[in-house]
């Protein structure tokens, strides 16, 4: 999923998927033709990129991609992995893997899912000239450096990774550069989904009308296409799917909303079946409104305040001091209580508290405490290097309930540091993310990361490793990279978690982004549906929702 997959209030990597989510579009059925009454109506948002698994790192697109494709592994609602397309995955050293596929899997165009479907897709995702946003997920594979533009002239020396070899139609081998503790776990992430041959003929066209092998497929109707941009996406069960996530409904309609208040009103009136993000205006009253029709709990979603290191005053030592000052100037606890009514928890590290291995008492995490005196002292030290002038502007997408908390953060910064700090709304998530991804945004911005698989490394490597696809601020620290590599090379998960936590000491010192809070998800539903559950990373368990 994303990548940073990341939602504003909720909704990752997959690969985050960045969890920068938004809800864009219009009202239920608006422009969507005749609504089939058996579709489960769920909220979503216009994907900012074509629906290609190796380049979908946002939560809007990620939730669709995960319905349309199936990988070697899949995750249940608790985040537990199990084999899906894979019949077996064998390794004796966490370096060399032999992967066998189950027979009789096929894409919705009728073509078979073969070893080449995986190997060709992974090579496409890794090749630098394809500029795929999830490229860094393939970095452990031997030969990645040669295809990713890692040669001296910055151009790929090869077009295929040497560590991938097709044995036959249903078997292939993978050789990694070094032991990678979470490689097996990441094989259910969207970056590793297979692609049919038709995709490579015209990837842009494929992204507009993807052909997958997952539990659902895009479903045109006599009155309109499955995907009406900025309106909705319809998916129906794939009759040829025989994996772990068999749908228990007759299809889903992802409705794109211009704001969460409208979505919440539709939920109450029965025009929406499931809403995965309660708007701030309804947080004090949703329990009264929904009765027993909601669920809540901590999920793997992290929110942060990001400032590109290339901006004036935010590079070098001056920038480090200013970011540390901003962290100390934000009253996280007050905002979590007053704006989010207890549905957020103040950050204690750079991952998420629901993940295995999370430690709320990391050395140095006092930099995440609200400390106005320290904030002013650090800002003054930065001014001694180069005097501050102008505004501190925080960009955000206005279609996902962000204004309240961005204004609160800006006011906290203004009151503590005595500078002019303001929020800057942008109308849609898609346009907002395009500026960030293209590195043309000229201000700070809100960000979020939704887990793609339950691993602390997955919250660290895509966002902070040098050159990673979701490293939107341009952070680079070779010492952090080395510490992260040590965590990935650990012989067991317990040691890996300890080393991942140790690697965060560099992040506490450098403060590449300002962690804000973790999600406590609240998902609400109408009386038309049942069996609604929230998954480990904050999304509804779509396949198991029952309507009628």
Q: Which residue ranges define each predicted feature?
A:
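Gly/Pro-rich hinge or "lid" segments in bacterial periplasmic/extracellular proteins
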Residues: 179-247, 251-253
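N-terminal lobe/hinge region of extracytoplasmic solute-binding protein
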Residues: 43-93, 123, 211
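Extracytoplasmic/peripheral linker and loop segments enriched in polar/acidic and small residues
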Residues: 165, 324, 336-337, 419-433, ...
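Alpha-helical secondary-structure segments
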Residues: 113-123, 169-175, 215, 249-251, ...
């Amino acid at each position: 999923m994303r990548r940073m997959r990341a939602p504003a209030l909720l909704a990752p990597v997959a690969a985050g998927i960045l969890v920068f989510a938004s809800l864009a579009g219009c009202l239920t059925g608006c422009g969507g033709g005749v609504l089939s009454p058996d579709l489960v109506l769920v909220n979503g948002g216009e994907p900012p990129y074509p629906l290609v698994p190796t380049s979908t790192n946002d939560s809007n697109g990620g939730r669709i991609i995960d319905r349309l494709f199936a990988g070697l592994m899949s995750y249940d609602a608790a985040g537990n992995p199990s084999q899906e397309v894979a019949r077996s995955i064998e390794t004796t050293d966490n370096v060399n893997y032999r992967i066998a596929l189950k027979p009789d899997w096929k894409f919705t165009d009728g073509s078979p899912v073969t070893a080449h479907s995986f190997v060709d897709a992974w090579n496409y995702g890794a090749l630098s000239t394809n500029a795929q946003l999830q490229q860094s997920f393939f970095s452990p594979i031997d030969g990645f450096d040669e295809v990713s533009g890692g040669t001296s002239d910055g151009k790929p020396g090869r077009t295929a990774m040497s560590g991938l070899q097709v044995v036959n139609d249903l078997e292939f081998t993978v050789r990694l550069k070094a032991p990678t503790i979470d490689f097996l776990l990441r094989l259910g992430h969207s970056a590793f989904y297979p692609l049919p041959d038709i995709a490579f003929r015209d990837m842009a066209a494929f992204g507009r009308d993807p052909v997958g092998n997952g539990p659902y497929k895009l479903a045109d109707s006599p009155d309109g296409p499955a995907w009406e941009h900025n309106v909705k996406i319809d998916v129906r069960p794939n009759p040829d799917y025989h994996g772990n996530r068999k749908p228990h409904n007759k299809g889903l309609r992802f409705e794109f909303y211009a704001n969460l208040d409208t979505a919440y009103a539709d939920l109450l009136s029965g025009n929406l079946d499931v809403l995965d993000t309660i708007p701030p205006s309804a947080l004090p009253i949703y329990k009264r409104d929904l009765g027993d029709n909601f669920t809540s709990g901590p999920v793997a979603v992290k929110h942060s305040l990001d400032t590109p290191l290339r901006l004036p005053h935010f590079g070098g030592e001056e920038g480090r001091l200013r970011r540390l000052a901003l962290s100390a100037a934000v009253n996280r606890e007050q905002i979590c209580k007053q704006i989010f009514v207890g549905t957020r928890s103040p950050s204690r590290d750079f991952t998420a508290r629901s993940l295995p291995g999370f430690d709320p008492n990391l050395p140095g995490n006092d930099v995440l405490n609200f400390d106005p005196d320290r904030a002013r002292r650090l800002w003054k030290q930065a001014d001694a290097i180069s005097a501050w002038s102008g505004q501190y502007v925080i960009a955000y997408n206005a279609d996902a309930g962000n204004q309240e908390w961005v204004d609160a953060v800006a006011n906290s910064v203004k009151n503590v540091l005595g500078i002019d700090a303001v929020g800057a709304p942008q109308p849609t998530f898609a346009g907002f993310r395009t500026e960030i991804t293209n590195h043309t945004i000229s201000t700070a911005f809100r960000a979020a990361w939704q887990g793609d698989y339950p691993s602390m490394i997955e919250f660290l490597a895509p966002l902070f490793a040098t050159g990673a696809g979701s490293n939107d601020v341009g952070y680079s620290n070779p010492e952090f990279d080395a510490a992260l590599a040590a965590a990935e090379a650990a012989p067991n998960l317990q040691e890996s978690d300890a080393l991942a936590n140790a690697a965060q000491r560099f992040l506490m010192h450098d403060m590449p982004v300002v962690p804000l809070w973790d999600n406590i998800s609240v998902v609400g539903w109408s009386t038309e549906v049942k069996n609604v559950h929230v998954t480990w990373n904050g999304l509804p368990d779509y396949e198991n929702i029952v309507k009628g």
